[in-house]
């Protein structure tokens, strides 16, 4: 199963490149799910209306059950957002990553190149993305089960399926540290208050003693 999506809103560049890929996957009887994005759906469907899709070949505007689709996939095509890549690698999926251009500090390109460098996927920059370049990458990987399996293993190695537990532990650690600091400050304040109270009591005693009148004797003439 090939899963393709261009982020929650879709990607025109990916959609344009996928037209040839979808045609060839239909011809080769490959199972796929392609989420076009709601705003691009009608346009994409019009471009492939001559094709007869099988029940296991789906083009949808938006994928409601991404978790199960991702778990069932053998190859993922998508952008290089941090959350997407975390999900892909947590499940050990080989991927073709297409980083969006003009993202903050070009982080998607760095993400994609990191995945490729570690052997977990193939990176195709948006400026180099064409229907032919994407189709060639898909055809190569689907035709080479050994390479696909190797990528899956590498993806699993760099994935962090326990990430949510690590994040929870870190939050708990910070929370406990803050509480400990607050408690320490509270106890310190209480201690100072008690010291001030003791000091005031001592001063009051001194004032009471010093305010006692002296008996002045009257001399008889």
List the predicted regions and their residue ranges.
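Short hydrophobic beta-strand element within catalytic cores of glycosyltransferases
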Residues: 78, 94-105
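Donor-nucleotide binding loops and adjacent catalytic segments primarily
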Residues: 1-76, 109-113, 117, 124-133
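Two-component system phosphotransfer/interaction surface
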Residues: 130-143, 172
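A short, well-ordered alpha-helix in the C-terminal region of glycosyltransferases
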Residues: 147-161
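C-terminal alpha-helical cap of glycosyltransferases
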Residues: 160-194, 213-221
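Short, acidic/turn-prone active-site loops that include or flank metal/cofactor-
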Residues: 62, 82, 100-104, 128
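Short, glycine/polar-rich helix-capping loops at beta-to-alpha or helix-loop-helix junctions
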Residues: 84, 105-112
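Acidic donor-binding loop of glycosyltransferase active sites
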Residues: 71-86, 93-94
């Amino acid at each position: 199963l090939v899963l393709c999506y261009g982020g929650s809103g879709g990607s025109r560049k990916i959609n344009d490149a996928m037209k040839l890929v979808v045609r060839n996957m239909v011809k080769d009887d490959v199972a796929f799910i392609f989420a076009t994005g709601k705003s691009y759906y009608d346009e994409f469907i019009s471009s492939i209306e001559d094709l007869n899709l099988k029940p296991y070949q789906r083009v949808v505007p938006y994928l409601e059950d991404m978790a199960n689709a991702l778990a069932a996939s053998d190859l993922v095509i998508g952008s290089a957002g941090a959350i997407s890549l975390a999900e892909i690698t947590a499940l050990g999926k080989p991927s073709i990553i297409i980083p969006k251009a003009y993202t903050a500090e070009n982080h998607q390109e760095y993400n994609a190149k990191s995945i490729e460098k570690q052997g977990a996927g193939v990176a195709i920059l948006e400026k180099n993305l064409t229907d032919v370049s994407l189709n060639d990458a898909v055809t190569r990987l689907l035709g080479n089960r050994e390479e696909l399996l190797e990528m899956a293993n590498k993806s699993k190695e760099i994935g962090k399926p326990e990430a949510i537990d690590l994040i929870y532990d870190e939050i708990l650690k910070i929370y406990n540290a803050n509480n400990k600091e607050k408690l320490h400050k509270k106890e310190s304040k209480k201690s100072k208050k008690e010291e001030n109270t003791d000091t005031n009591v001592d001063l009051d005693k001194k004032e009471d003693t010093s305010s006692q009148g002296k008996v002045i004797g009257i001399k008889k003439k």
